[in-house]
Curated annotation (Swiss-Prot):
UniProt cross-references to PROSITE patterns, sorted A to Z: RIBOSOMAL_L15 (PS00475)
Name of this protein: Large ribosomal subunit protein uL15
The keyword RNA-binding is annotated on this UniProt entry: yes
Record's subunit section: Part of the 50S ribosomal subunit.
Protein family (similarity comment): Belongs to the universal ribosomal protein uL15 family.
Basic and acidic residues compositional bias, start-end: 1-18
Keyword annotations from UniProtKB, A to Z: Ribonucleoprotein, Ribosomal protein, RNA-binding, rRNA-binding
Annotated gene: rplO
Reported function: Binds to the 23S rRNA.
Organism for this UniProt entry: Listeria welshimeri serovar 6b (strain ATCC 35897 / DSM 20650 / CCUG 15529 / CIP 8149 / NCTC 11857 / SLCC 5334 / V8)
């Protein structure tokens, strides 16, 4: 086989469909848009959620809830991620940011118990789940709320 003999595999390349190029092509005159109407016009089409003039679902259903502007959002760290640190390391928020585990502290850091921990670490965070605290202490480590 030579370079000039290379061809793309069958069915991997599809030719662009050129519309509005004569009635013989099968896609001439109206270019596959049918006759008149909103969808035949340039830029024509209905907005998202439009139901043909019927009151749309998002307006039929009542409003519910609100966004609390004073909410606290915690950066979440799971136990299995903490295994990358050496035994006896003091894991602080600064160390977590430095090592790229979290991007920023947000309203604080919460340690959750996804995965398991084999290292003996001193973990400093704003919050711990009960299971995470138990697992860290079972591995011989300490938890400190800051």
């Amino acid at each position: 086989m030579k370079l000039h003999e290379l061809k793309p595999s069958e069915g991997s390349r599809k030719e662009r469909n050129r519309v509005g190029r004569g009635t013989g092509s099968g896609n001439g005159k109206t270019s596959g848009r049918g006759h008149k109407g909103q969808k035949a016009r340039s830029g024509g089409g209905v907005r998202l959620g439009f139901e043909g003039g019927q009151l749309p679902l998002f307006r039929r259903i009542p409003k519910r809830g609100f966004t609390n502007i004073n909410r606290k959002e915690f950066a979440i760290v799971n136990l299995d991620v903490l295994n990358r640190f050496e035994d006896g390391t003091e894991v602080t928020p600064e160390l977590l940011i430095e090592s790229g585990i979290i991007r920023n502290e947000k309203s604080g850091i919460k340690i959750l118990s996804d995965g398991n921990i084999e290292k003996k670490l001193t973990v400093k965070a704003n919050k711990f789940s009960a299971a995470a605290k138990e697992a860290i202490e079972a591995a011989g480590g300490k938890t400190e709320v800051i």
